């Protein structure tokens, strides 16, 4: 029993250390021109550093194009330690994109994947 308690504590502590080691990128690091892609559709978007609210920045892009790729067209964005969230005006999430090397990916309910990649 003692070994189980020690193992549980070590697991909890190491998990906490790993989570706290993720760095939150700044808006300036992520701002700029990006491409949102689906299987056959691509939309150019711009992640701006203009503040929409306290923790969300403005996103600019073709609304009609974005609505074809996501459940609704986002108007804002915010960085997270493990990804990037596109948001509505009130800050609620439209889609969370998890970081995958040099791009960010979001899986829709139907299983299709959307990719965000920063233009060079």
Swiss-Prot record:
Its main location: periplasm. Keywords: Disulfide bond, Metalloenzyme inhibitor, Metalloprotease inhibitor, Periplasm, Protease inhibitor, Signal. Monomer. One of its GO terms (cellular component) is periplasmic space. SUPFAM superfamilies: beta-Barrel protease inhibitors (SSF50882). It is found in: Periplasm. This is Proteinase inhibitor. Disulfide bonds join 43-65. Pfam families: Inh. The lineage of its organism: Bacteria, Pseudomonadati, Pseudomonadota, Gammaproteobacteria, Enterobacterales. GO terms for molecular function: metalloendopeptidase inhibitor activity. Residues 1-19 form the signal peptide. Belongs to the protease inhibitor I38 family. Inhibitor of the extracellular proteases A, B, and C of E.chrysanthemi and the S.marcescens 50 kDa extracellular protease. It forms a non-covalent bond with the proteases and may prevent autocatalytic cleavage of the proteases zymogen in the periplasm.
């Amino acid at each position: 029993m003692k070994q189980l308690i020690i193992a549980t504590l070590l697991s909890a502590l190491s998990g906490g250390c790993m989570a706290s080691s993720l760095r939150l990128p700044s808006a300036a690091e992520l701002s700029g021109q990006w491409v949102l892609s689906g299987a056959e559709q691509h939309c150019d978007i711009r992640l701006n550093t203009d503040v929409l609210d306290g923790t969300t920045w403005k996103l600019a892009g073709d609304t009609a194009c974005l609505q074809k790729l996501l459940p609704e067209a986002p108007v804002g964005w915010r960085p997270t330690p493990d990804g990037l969230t596109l948001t509505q005006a009130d800050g609620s999430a439209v889609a969370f994109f998890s970081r995958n090397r040099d791009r960010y990916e979001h899986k829709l309910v139907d299983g299709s994947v959307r990719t965000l990649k920063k233009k060079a």
